[in-house]
């Protein structure tokens, strides 16, 4: 084993909840975040929900001395809300959009845990994220994933992501922890947190993570993990509705770990079980999306028929000797607009759910192929 000195690498992640004019005390909280980052001087800072470019420019101007390098990921009409600050040069950056929903900045939120309609969406996104990590991380010495993943530690999507990629959870692996009980990052006592999110979890929820893995002869371990704990001393409000997470990673060159890091090539029976479970959930999602697509299609046809009847009623007086249509004109126009709106909206929904079905089916096929490949290796 190489005796090269270990390199300390500090990663900070925070969902800033920075919806300008809607989120409470945005500017005051950004000033608190700037002060924290300037004092702690993390190597890499990963911020989410910085929705306004003005807020990003404010952060960049204040962090010039401690974090001179940064990138703001622009996407769509409202942006991605993602930005990265670093003490070292950022040589390259890339924004990947999930194929379903098109969000580049998050896995789909869990709006109702009991009736989670978006579970198949999050599984698809976790699968795509896992594939992205596998394909882009092959030439990297160290891979780090940080942010709000909108998944509990034991959720299927989280298990799929970690088992498929070999990423390690810094909270579970750390040698020393300091912060909220259980590493929770969404606390009921946080004055900015939504009551609905934490009502079923009075002790809090852990949905913000720093995941990591080494490769190409580098071993990585988490020496220290820290979370903020509500309102900091001397302040009258927390940094955000989420708690920040800071991981101190120790990276050391070690040629003996090459075979251990090739997680992709391991024939893991647990991964087969997780993929089968994920496929079952995707099939449920496909069935639900097909039902909604069918209903949308019927509604679009109904709207089109009503619109066609309107056209016929308008043409009849022009081509016959029948007296002018006695149907009230105002009601006639209103009915026409309603029919057009129903046909248009239902048609858009039909197209959207058709895309949803195809994306879910494609992911289910990919998982099926992965299971077959794993089972073949297990059989040999």
PLM-predicted stretches and their roles:
Residues 10, 68-69, 89-92, 166-169, ...:
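Conserved beta-strand segments of alpha/beta enzyme cores
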Residues 10-17, 29, 33-59, 85, ...:
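Active-site beta-strand/loop signature of hydrolases that rely on acidic residues for catalysis
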Residues 106, 119-123:
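Binuclear metal-dependent hydrolase catalytic cores centered on His/Asp/Glu-rich metal-binding motifs
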Residues 21, 54, 102, 153, ...:
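Generic structural signal for helix capping and beta-alpha/helix-loop junctions
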Residues 24-26, 122, 344:
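Conserved SAM-binding loop and adjacent beta-strand
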Residues 120, 131-144, 150-380:
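Metal-dependent phosphoester-hydrolase catalytic domains
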Residues 3-5, 16, 25-26, 37-38, ...:
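Structured beta-strand-rich core segments of catalytic domains in phosphoester-bond hydrolases
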Residues 1-11, 16, 21, 26-30, ...:
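N-terminal signal-anchor transmembrane helix
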């Amino acid at each position: 084993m190489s005796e090269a000195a270990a390199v300390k690498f500090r990663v900070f992640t925070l969902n800033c909840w920075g919806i300008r004019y809607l989120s409470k005390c945005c500017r005051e909280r950004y000033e608190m975040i700037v002060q924290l980052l300037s004092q702690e001087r993390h190597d890499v800072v990963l911020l989410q929900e910085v929705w306004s470019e003005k807020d990003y420019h404010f952060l960049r101007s204040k962090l010039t001395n401690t974090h001179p390098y940064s990138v703001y990921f622009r996407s769509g009409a409202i942006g991605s809300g993602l930005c990265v600050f670093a003490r070292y040069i950022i040589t390259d950056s890339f924004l990947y959009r999930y194929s379903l929903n098109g969000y580049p900045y998050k896995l789909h939120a869990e709006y109702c845990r009991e009736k989670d309609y978006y579970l198949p969406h999050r599984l698809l996104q976790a699968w795509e994220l896992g594939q992205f990590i596998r394909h882009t991380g092959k030439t990297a010495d160290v891979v780090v994933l940080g942010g709000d993943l909108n998944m509990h530690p034991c959720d299927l999507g989280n298990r799929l992501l970690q088992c498929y990629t070999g990423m390690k959870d810094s909270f579970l692996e750390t040698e020393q922890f300091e912060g909220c009980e259980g590493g929770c990052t969404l606390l009921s006592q946080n004055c900015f947190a939504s009551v609905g999110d934490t009502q079923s979890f009075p002790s809090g929820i852990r949905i913000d993570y720093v995941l990591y893995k080494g490769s190409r002869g580098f071993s990585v371990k988490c020496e220290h993990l820290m979370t903020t704990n509500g309102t900091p001393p001397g302040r009258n409000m927390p940094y955000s509705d989420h708690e920040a997470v800071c991981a101190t990673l120790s990276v050391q060159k070690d040629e003996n770990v090459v075979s251990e890091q090739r997680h992709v090539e391991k024939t893991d029976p647990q991964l087969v079980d997780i993929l089968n479970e994920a496929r079952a959930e995707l099939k449920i999602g496909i069935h639900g999306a097909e039902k909604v697509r069918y209903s949308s299609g019927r509604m679009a046809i109904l709207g089109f028929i009503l619109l066609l009847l309107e056209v016929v009623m308008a043409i009849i007086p022009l081509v016959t000797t029948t007296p002018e249509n006695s149907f009230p004109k105002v009601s006639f126009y209103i009915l026409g607009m309603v029919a057009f709106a129903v046909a248009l909206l239902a048609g858009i929904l039909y197209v959207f759910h058709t895309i949803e079905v195809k994306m879910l089916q494609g992911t289910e096929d990919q998982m099926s192929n992965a299971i077959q490949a794993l089972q073949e290796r297990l059989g040999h």
